[in-house]
Amino acid sequence: MIVYNQALTEKVEYMLDKLSIRGYTLWENVQGRGTSTGVPHLGTHVWPEINKSLLTVVEDDKVDRLLEAVKKIDNINEEVGIRAFVWDVIKTV
């Protein structure tokens, strides 16, 4: 799962294309706040920024490359915000 400020949408889409990651589910207008840094993204008058969240299932050999690409985006845009989370998928239907 990748959660990111909507301002990073083009960068995230480009990253997925470059890594040949085609399938995903996208949620828009995702509210939240980081655990230690950054401002809340609540879509309100006081905190107007808002996130998107993207869920994709990728092969094991793509996980590290995906995480490295997310980290690269974050390093360039630390104040904007992007995070990636990894779970093991045991089975799918």
Predicted regions and their residues:
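Positively charged, small/polar-rich N-terminal and surface patches that mediate targeting and assembly
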Residues: 1-93
